[in-house]
């Protein structure tokens, strides 16, 4: 019997999608407010507030599949511990699916700020576009991505300015962003076998990939 864990379940959309397909899925999310929102939005789904780097979060051999999608893995500093935990939580023969990007080439600008949503604006830019400005009805939104390659760190800064009051709110996301090769080597060192790689270009996510990792029997 399948049992699926979505790490970094956020608003719960992936868990709900899997549940709608008849798959027993549950979510793990670090943010308690996100868990509350997901539970309100999808009361028929199961979500847990917890840390994927804490080994005691789940018992060994609990899941057949684990997913870690979008940029969740880049918010986790201790990726080695993350892989150890996923390996322990998976049953023998289980799968871990992780979402990674080419940090030098993926598109960090938002679709609504991209004048060529169906054709990557990056292809036609002389230099990589790493910032965007979007005008919404009542506020202006700015986003900027910076990468510090020597330290494997990235920062994504969002700034929102209210048109009426002039009030500014800023969210700064700190990402721990080594190369894909390094991350996959950590997974392999844990015992995972790389079974496949899916290029997400067909769904407009250029230089983003799903890696399928297998825990041997």
Show which residues each predicted segment covers:
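Conserved class I S-adenosyl-L-methionine
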Residues: 2-8
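A short SAM/SAH-binding and catalytic strip from SAM-dependent methyltransferases
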Residues: 64-78
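SAM-dependent methyltransferase
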Residues: 100-181
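Class I SAM-dependent methyltransferase SAM/SAH-binding core
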Residues: 11-55
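A short acidic, Gly/Pro-enriched loop at the edge of an enzyme's catalytic core
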Residues: 57-65
């Amino acid at each position: 019997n399948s049992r699926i864990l979505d790490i970094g379940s956020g608003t719960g959309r992936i868990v709900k999608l899997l549940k709608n397909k008849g798959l027993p899925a549950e979510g793990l999310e670090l943010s308690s407010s996100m868990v509350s929102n997901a539970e309100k939005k999808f009361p028929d789904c199961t979500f847990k507030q917890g840390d994927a780097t804490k080994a005691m979060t789940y018992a060994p051999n609990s899941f057949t599949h684990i997913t870690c999608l979008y940029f969740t893995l880049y918010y986790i500093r201790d990726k080695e511990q993350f892989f150890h935990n996923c390996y322990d939580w998976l049953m023998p023969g289980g799968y871990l699916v992780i979402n990674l990007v080419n940090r030098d080439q993926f598109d960090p600008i938002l679709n609504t700020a991209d004048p060529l949503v169906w054709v990557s604006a990056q292809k036609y830019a002389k230099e990589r576009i790493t910032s965007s400005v979007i005008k919404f009805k009542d506020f202006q939104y700015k986003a900027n991505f910076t990468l510090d390659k020597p330290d494997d760190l990235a920062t994504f800064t969002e700034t929102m300015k209210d048109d009426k009051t002039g009030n500014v709110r800023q969210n700064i996301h700190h990402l721990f962003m080594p190369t894909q090769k390094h991350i996959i080597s950590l997974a392999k060192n844990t015992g995972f076998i790389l079974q496949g790689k899916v290029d997400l270009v067909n769904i407009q996510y250029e230089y983003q990939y799903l890696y399928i990792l297998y825990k041997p029997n």
